[in-house]
C-alpha cells in the first residue's frame, strides 16, 4: 500500500513464504518495479527505502529451487492504489504442476 517501503514489502513476502511451507527460505530480493524497463526500480530487497506511491507497478516474486526436488515460482504483478494495491495478474491462484 502507499507509504510502505520496498524493504517492507520484502519483509512481508519473506515472512509469508516462511510461514507457509518453506521455513528456511532465503532471498536477496523478491521483486522489482516494472516501468520503462521490465526490471526497473525499486528493488524489493533489504535496504531499499523507496516509498511506494499510487501508480507504481511492482512484480513480487518468491521463486524457490531445491536440488533433487525441483522448483516453484510464485509471481504477482500489482499496481499501488490510493488505499492498497490491485493485482494485474489474470491467472488466478491455482497451482499448476508440470510433470517432467
Language-model features: locations:
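Active-site neighborhoods and metal-handling regions in enzymes and metal-associated proteins
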Residues: 1-100
Amino acid at each position: 500500500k502507499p507509504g510502505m517501503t520496498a524493504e517492507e514489502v520484502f519483509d512481508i513476502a519473506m515472512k509469508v513464504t516462511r510461514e507457509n511451507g518453506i521455513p528456511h527460505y532465503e532471498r536477496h530480493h523478491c521483486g522489482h518495479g516494472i516501468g520503462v524497463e521490465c526490471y526497473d526500480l525499486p528493488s524489493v530487497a533489504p535496504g531499499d527505502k523507496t516509498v511506494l506511491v499510487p501508480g507504481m507497478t511492482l512484480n513480487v516474486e518468491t521463486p524457490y529451487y531445491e536440488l533433487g526436488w525441483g522448483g516453484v515460482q510464485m509471481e504477482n504483478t500489482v499496481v499501488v492504489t490510493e488505499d492498497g494495491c490491485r493485482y494485474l495478474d489474470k491467472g488466478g491462484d491455482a497451482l499448476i504442476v508440470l510433470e517432467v
